[in-house]
C-alpha cells in the first residue's frame, strides 16, 4: 500500500533521482524541492527542472543564495577541488543538508506533507558530517519539536554503496534514465561526467562494480 505523499529533496543527480523513482513507487503523490545556493553550475537546477517536467511532478525551486555568500568551498567558489586523506573535502558546504532539510520541512508542512525523502548516504562516506544517519535522526527529532509536526525523513540510500544504488535504480526501472539524464559531475557534465572529479570517480566505480556483479561488464 502506498503512503499518501512525499517531498523529495532534489538536485537532479544520481542519488536524488534514484530517490525520486523510489518515492514514485511508494507514494501516491510526489513533489520535488531544489535549492539554488550559489552552486558553480546553475545547470544543476536546469537538469532538475527538466527531470521534474518529464516526470510531470510539481517542482519547487527555493533561493538559498545566502549560503553561497557565507561559505567558501569548491562547489560555490571558483577554487580547485581538494580532498586530503582524513580531512573533510573542500566540496563540503557547511550547513547545506541541515538548511535544505529544514527549509524542506517548512515547505512540506505548508503542503500537508509528512514524509521528506533525501538521498544522503553514509556507506560511501566522503567525510561529509551531514550525511550521517545520526545527524538525520537528530534533525528529524528537532524539526518535529520545532514545528509540532510529525515529519518522517526517509533515507532510502543511507546504507547502500554506489553499486547498490545503481542496483536500486535498475530495480525501479530507472537505470538508463539515471545513467543518461542526471548530473553528478562537479564540473557540470551530464551523464557520464568528466571522469576526473571525486563525484565522477565514485559514480563510475559503483557503476562498474554493479555491472560486473550483474554480468554486463
From Swiss-Prot:
It catalyses: 7-carboxy-7-deazaguanine + NH4(+) + ATP = 7-cyano-7-deazaguanine + ADP + phosphate + H2O + H(+). Binds 1 zinc ion per subunit. Its EC number is 6.3.4.20. It comes from the Bacteria. Pathway: Purine metabolism; 7-cyano-7-deazaguanine biosynthesis. Its cofactor is Zn(2+). Keywords: ATP-binding, Ligase, Metal-binding, Nucleotide-binding, Queuosine biosynthesis, Zinc. ATP binds at residues 10-20. CDD domains: QueC-like. The keyword rRNA-binding does not apply. One of its GO terms (molecular function) is ATP binding. InterPro entries: QueC, Rossmann-like_a/b/a_fold. One of its GO terms (biological process) is queuosine biosynthetic process. Pfam families: QueC. The keyword Transmembrane does not apply. Zn(2+) binds at residues 185, 194, 197, 200. PANTHER family: 7-CYANO-7-DEAZAGUANINE SYNTHASE. Catalyzes the ATP-dependent conversion of 7-carboxy-7-deazaguanine (CDG) to 7-cyano-7-deazaguanine (preQ(0)). Homodimer. Belongs to the QueC family. HAMAP family: QueC (MF_01633). This is 7-cyano-7-deazaguanine synthase.
